[in-house]
């Protein structure tokens, strides 16, 4: 199978029981801020910040907001590579990884819709942590 060039191609070829939830998550994340774009990274939908930022080492993944891990058929795992820096009063973010990542696990479209506001707040709070070069 040919490697997908963009998220549309990736999702159109996706055979996952939670396709509807993936589409809902995509819309929620992209609608949260006009400076969020998407790409295929690590063979998954990935969302990153396109706005102004202070210079940084690309290996720090400071532009990467969230990667959608679709490797399990019974759930979707949102991986925030720098999630430890996010203020999350809702408690939606989980994990104590030494590399600073945090995750959110969804098992259904209904669960995604239930946490829509909290997820948008997590993404907004991530954007607030950005060191801007102004």
Task: Label each PLM-derived region with a short phrase.
Residues 1-134:
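Charge-dense, helix-prone N-terminal extensions
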């Amino acid at each position: 199978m040919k490697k997908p060039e963009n998220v549309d191609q990736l999702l159109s070829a996706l055979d996952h029981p939670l396709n509807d939830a993936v589409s809902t998550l995509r819309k929620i994340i992209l609608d949260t801020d006009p400076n969020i774009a998407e790409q295929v990274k690590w063979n998954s939908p990935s969302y990153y910040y396109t706005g102004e930022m202070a210079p940084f080492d690309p290996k720090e993944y400071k532009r990467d907001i969230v990667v959608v891990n679709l490797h399990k058929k019974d759930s979707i795992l949102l991986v925030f590579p720098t999630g430890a820096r996010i203020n999350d009063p809702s408690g939606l973010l989980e994990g104590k990884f030494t590399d600073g990542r945090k995750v959110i696990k969804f098992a259904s479209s209904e669960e995604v819709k239930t946490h829509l506001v909290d997820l948008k707040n997590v993404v907004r709070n991530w954007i607030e942590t950005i060191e801007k070069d102004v």
